[in-house]
Amino acid sequence: MMKPINSLTNVSSWSGFDEMSRLLSFAVLFTFSLTGRAQTDSTMVRNDSVTWNKSLEGVTVTAQRQLIRQDIDRIGYDVQGDEDSKTENVLDMLRKVPMVTIDGEDNILVKGNSNYKIYKNGHLDPSLSKNAREILKAMPASAVKRIEVITDPGAREDAEGVNAILNIVMMDTKKMAGVTGSLTGSYNSLRYPSLGAYLATQLGKAILSVDYGYNYMSKKATTTNGHVERTFVSTGNTEVVDSRGTNPGYVHYVDVNASYDIDTLNLLSASFGGYFYKVDVQGGSDVTMCDRGGNPLYHYADDYWMPDYYHHSWNGRLDYEHKTHRKDEKFTLSYMLALTRQHTEQETNYVDALDIPFNYTGFLLNSREHFTEHTFQADYVRPLWEGHKFEIGTKYIFRQNSSDNAQHFYDAASTTTSDLFDHTTQIAAAYADYIYHKGKWVARAGLRYEYSHMKGHYPDGKTADFGKHLSDWVPQASVKYQVDDRQSLKLAYTTSITRPGITYLNPAVYSYPASVQFGNAHLESAREQSILFTYMYVGQRLTLQLVPQFHFYHNALGSIVYAEGDTRYSTYGNVLKQHRFQMEGYVQWKPFNATTFVANITFTDNHANHNAAQLKQHLTSMYYYAYLSQKLPWKLTATAYTYGEVGHSPMNIYAYGRPWMRYAFMLQRSFLSDDRLTVRLMANAPFHKNLHYKTCTTQGDIIGWGDNINTQNNQFFRLSVSYRFGKLKASVKKTETTIENSDVVGGISKGK
């Protein structure tokens, strides 16, 4: 259980400046004398408390409830302690959570990236992980007790490639009267409607909650243009591509959770959810190849469309938890089923052709991919004696991937190519975690072992089958020291592994006029090791976190791009050696009662070596996010935020992204009793219509630059309305441990 940071009674809104002064003093002296400074700060806090108590006569005191709590492996934000939880949804509250950022399109990043999973009440919620922004937008913040960022997952999850876990802890009171929930709807100037509903009810010992949503993406909202120039080093020829595209369509999602209290010691919980989307993809491009002197060698235009493109993913989970009469001792059994199906049918025609280097006028591509996963897991937690706890568990995963790809070319011979590929993975794992807590010290150490067997099979017999056995030991350890009531220090060592998915493994060859791409069936799992040091200060008005860290790996999965003549070839390999230094910073400051400022900053210094291409890369970048909220008269709340990146962020060993910036403004007001009705107006980039994302390719067989332009969907105005009904007194209970799989890259996309 997380220990709350002690709070001090606040006399004046100007105490935030006092905290800033004390913090700056600490930062200067910290380098010279950590221990001495810790004792001085503790004394100063006690003296301040005494001074304030003596001067309180005749003064009205406004107490500030401490909203941020910390433990050895996580940081928690007290949603119920935030007055805004009465009128906002969970997605809004995430903007205030340390190390979490929300962009203008409501995409969620944790610790500056999308490599995370989302838990609900301590266990994985697959539907929530895949449709987070839609579900959390429909869920009222009043239904949530706190939000946790698990920064250092223990041995139970750590091997499976997740940088962080976002845990949504629901309200857990025992009784509920009737039905409670919320209805949400929004519409923006890009003709993009969105609807959502969250319902919860109790039937005897059973509690049920349902999330449902629908989004329609218009043609205007999905229009993009691009310009790319590629120079082939060996020939000196340059390819110029101007592209256009749009993908209007719709998506439905649902997430159902249920729990049943068998008795005070036994709990059964289940969930079912998923999403389905279908889009009408259309687009085209104009391609010109020029020689060194700029003279055209050939030219063509293409038009493509996908009359049948759909993707659906479904999952189910069942957990049984048994608690003993010993405090905090429990045993959990879990099963999870995940299904993903994807079908792509793309037709492409070439027109306005001049001296083209291929003999067909178009092609029809038909692709089907299936993914099925069964997971079984058992977990046991045993407190040994005061301050000591032991956790053990085991896990088995069986994955089946299959793909069927056929490509028919419109040429004189009506050539057809076909590739069938099946891939299975079996994983057996066991872990042990030990936690020690005494006084100001907390320590944690764990070890995980994973054995995996991968097998590739080609039903058409065109390629020989293959198999591979992998064994991985994954240690982790961390230690935390609470300097005083406000400050703490932590040192952590973590490792993780990542396995290739079917897209990376599938050797099927996809041929286009100027490019060829294929997978690599002989890829291995990759291992990353990290060392992190964390300093955290939690005060009444000011919260600060600094996390310098070092990451390194020697066989990471990476792209292999090369050229033969004027044709671009791409595949994958265990070819990257990388060393990365990062400095993560978070600050939350309340200089006045009605003002909140939040900032997340991540500085990255990245060194990479590509073994296959004998290339090196050194890039630095900084991602930033700043959020300012101001309460105004008449129940109005004004919010502004900006986010972006400066420097050069690596895309791969060959290319990097250029700086970019986004911003938005919001105005909100609540109506009716208990602020049940909330209306919000948002302006996203009102002064910039086009959204540019520029890239540069500076080494390898092909160099050049690109500019991807969202011509419409950067600038929009959105009106949102939400209505809460019923009185929330309970939420679906969940077992505190369950299944989470996140070790695959390059598979069928599961979304975020």
Predicted regions and their residues:
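Flexible loop and strand-edge segments within Gram-negative outer membrane beta-barrel domains
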Residues: T40, M44-R46, M217-Y253, S259-D261, ...
